[in-house]
Regions:
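Conserved core of the sugar-phosphate nucleotidyltransferase
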Residues: 114-194
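Phosphate- and divalent-cation-binding pockets in alpha/beta enzyme and binding domains
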Residues: 13, 59-62, 116, 184, ...
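Conserved N-terminal catalytic core of the sugar/cofactor nucleotidyltransferase
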Residues: 2-5, 31-103, 195, 253
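Conserved beta-loop-beta/alpha segment of the NTase-like Rossmann-fold superfamily
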Residues: 73-145
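N-terminal nucleotide-binding beta1-loop-alpha1 segment
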Residues: 1-18, 252
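A structural signal for short hydrophobic beta-strand segments in well-ordered beta-sheet cores
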Residues: 25, 147-149, 218
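Short catalytic helix/loop segments, enriched in acidic residues and glycine
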Residues: 20-35
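Conserved alpha/beta core of the MobA/IspD/sugar-nucleotide pyrophosphorylase nucleotidyltransferase superfamily
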Residues: 1-3, 168-254
Length: 254
């Protein structure tokens, strides 16, 4: 399995923390967000990763070179997105659309997930096509990527931040593609990028469009831990989260 990590953005909503480094290189308990994502993939048998870079790409490349020199997996390639300042994340995926073949993941570069959560995503091989990893909670705010899905079947019916009716889950920023799912997504990305508004579109809008006329599935990981780093207040929560994960692994290894 291969993973595509979208890490081109600066993360300007984090203020001075990203003045001179991209969001994916912020450290949590001594390791960068990107390192932790790659560690999680490697632990779960994902052998290859493609990291889409943009803001201060030279720092990301240097971080990956250090991993490579230390013999740390997975095998990583980078693709530079020169349009990261003017195009949304659909532009990043457009540049790597040919990578959307076979079994692959698309992972937002600002999301941390537990290794057990990733194990569920990687092992969910019984569901071909496109599968959006979702969580559930009592209420959803305006910044959540909200989801409407069929409870019984798990089929996704709608996804977007502006959904108002029927919301019963949120996307955590991790998608899996199997069978023809990647090819369907790649074709839809290319169609959308040919429209006047293509560069302003989030890739999950394309997933929403696909769900209106074809099957898109969800994987409910409620109970597993994850965190998104978007705002300054998220950093403290993410730090506490990864410390807990690290301490649990250390205790298990002792």
């Amino acid at each position: 399995m291969k993973a595509i990590i979208l890490a081109a953005g600066q993360g300007s909503r984090l203020g001075h923390m990203t003045d001179d480094r991209p969001k994916c290189l912020i450290e949590f308990n001594g390791r960068s967000l990107l390192d932790r994502q790659l560690d999680t993939l490697d632990t779960n048998g994902v052998s290859e990763a493609v990291v889409v870079t943009g803001f201060h790409d030279e720092l990301v490349n240097a971080a990956i070179d250090r991993r490579r020199s230390a013999g740390q997996g997975p095998i990583v390639r980078t693709v530079f997105n020169p349009f990261y300042k003017v195009a949304d994340n659909l532009g990043s995926l457009f540049l790597v659309r040919d990578e959307l073949n076979g079994d692959c993941l698309v992972w937002n570069g600002d999301t941390l997930v537990s290794r057990s959560l990733m194990a569920k995503v990687v092992s969910n091989s019984g569901r071909d096509g496109i599968c959006v990893t979702i969580d559930r909670k009592d209420s959803y705010d305006e910044d959540d990527m909200k989801v409407v899905r069929d409870i019984d079947s798990g089929r996704l019916r709608a996804i977007g931040k502006r959904l108002a009716k029927g919301v019963n889950a949120e996307s955590i920023g991790l998608l899996a593609f199997r069978g023809d799912g990647g090819a369907r997504f790649a074709d839809a990305i290319e169609r959308e990028m040919r429209t006047p508004e293509g560069t302003t579109v989030w890739y999950l809008r394309v997933i929403h469009y696909l769900a209106q006329h074809s099957e898109v599935w969800t994987l409910d990981i409620s109970g597993d831990e994850w965190g998104e780093v978007d705002f300054p207040e998220d950093v403290e929560r993410a730090e506490a989260l990864v410390k807990r994960w690290d301490e649990a692994r250390e205790a298990k290894a002792a």
